[in-house]
């Protein structure tokens, strides 16, 4: 019943199945007609889902950089010149074991395995570091998805607001895309409430101020057509997306970037 109530609230933002144009004040034309054009700098910020983990402690499931690989491939195919930025060492630092396979394409080999995804982190931890990350990476886009590890705690929504506040203060020209976070494999009311606050309160507040902040709905990517959570889209049917789930996420991020920052036509 709670899930049904969530789904009855109309989305006001971008999602993969029906991407609507971003507000005109957020749209820009991107001139990238030759190799000398400046790459679009993209900072992916979040927890283990941003790093690309699966619920797979023995790493028997191949590691494919989570949504970041699919996003990179889509951007490249569309003609964008991009550079992912960030300094997280995960998952290669061995904190949760090291992937056994060699992903293909290997984003490390082409200098694109750059992000700020940190396994187990919550909004408070990201808040402590976001100033440093923005100052160092100087992003054009910030893809922010954080909160699954503390959505049930009262400070989470306020922390998220403070994170976005710090980003727009330090880098007002950057586009900040705040994700409504993915669910766990079983419905959790606190996540539904957290996402509602992102969609209906946080993002509209920043938009009224003229900030380049919008949202995407990553939650719906993990649902069945009837609106219930799809366990088959989770690795080991637990909490992290599997390859199909991550691909859906990649498409949603791509749709947002393309809508906000379309390539100029020749």
Identify the function of each model-found stretch.
Residues 41-46, 50-51, 82-87, 140-150, ...:
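Structural recognition of the beta-strand scaffold that forms the well-ordered cores
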Residues 50, 54, 72, 76-80, ...:
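Sec-exported extracytoplasmic/periplasmic mature domains
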Residues 1-89, 127, 261-266:
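N-terminal secretory targeting modules
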Residues 66-70, 156-206, 253:
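Extracytoplasmic, non-cytosolic globular domains
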Residues 52-159, 187-196:
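Conserved SGNH/GDSL esterase-like catalytic core that processes O-acyl groups on lipids
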Residues 107-110, 115-118, 182-266:
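Catalytic His-Asp segment of secreted/periplasmic serine-dependent ester chemistry enzymes
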Residues 125-126, 139-141, 146-152, 159-167, ...:
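Extracellular low-complexity, Gly/Ser/Thr-rich intrinsically disordered linkers
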């Amino acid at each position: 019943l709670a899930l049904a109530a969530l789904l009855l609230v109309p989305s006001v933002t971008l999602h993969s199945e029906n991407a609507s144009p971003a507000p005109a004040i957020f749209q820009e034309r991107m001139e990238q007609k030759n190799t000398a054009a400046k790459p679009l700098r993209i900072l992916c910020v979040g927890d283990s889902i941003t790093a690309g983990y699966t619920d797979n402690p023995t790493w028997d499931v191949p590691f494919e950089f989570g949504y970041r690989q699919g996003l990179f491939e889509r951007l490249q195919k569309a003609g964008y010149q991009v550079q992912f930025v960030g300094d997280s060492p995960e998952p290669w630092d061995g904190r949760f074991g090291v992937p056994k396979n060699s992903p293909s394409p290997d984003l490390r080999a082409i200098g694109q395995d750059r992000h700020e995804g940190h396994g187990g982190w919550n909004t408070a931890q990201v808040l402590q570091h976001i100033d440093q990350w923005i100052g160092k990476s100087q992003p054009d886009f910030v893809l922010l998805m954080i909160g699954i590890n503390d959505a049930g705690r009262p400070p989470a929504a306020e922390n998220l607001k403070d994170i976005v506040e710090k980003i727009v203060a330090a880098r007002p020209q950057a586009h900040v895309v705040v994700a409504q976070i993915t669910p766990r494999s079983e419905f959790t009311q606190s996540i539904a409430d957290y996402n509602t606050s992102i969609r209906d309160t946080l993002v509209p507040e920043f938009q009224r101020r003229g900030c380049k902040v919008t949202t995407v709905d990553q939650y719906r990517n993990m649902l069945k057509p009837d609106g219930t959570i799809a366990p088959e889209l989770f690795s080991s049917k637990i909490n992290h997306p599997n390859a199909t789930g991550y691909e859906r996420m990649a498409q949603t991020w791509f749709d947002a970037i393309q809508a906000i920052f379309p390539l100029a036509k020749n």
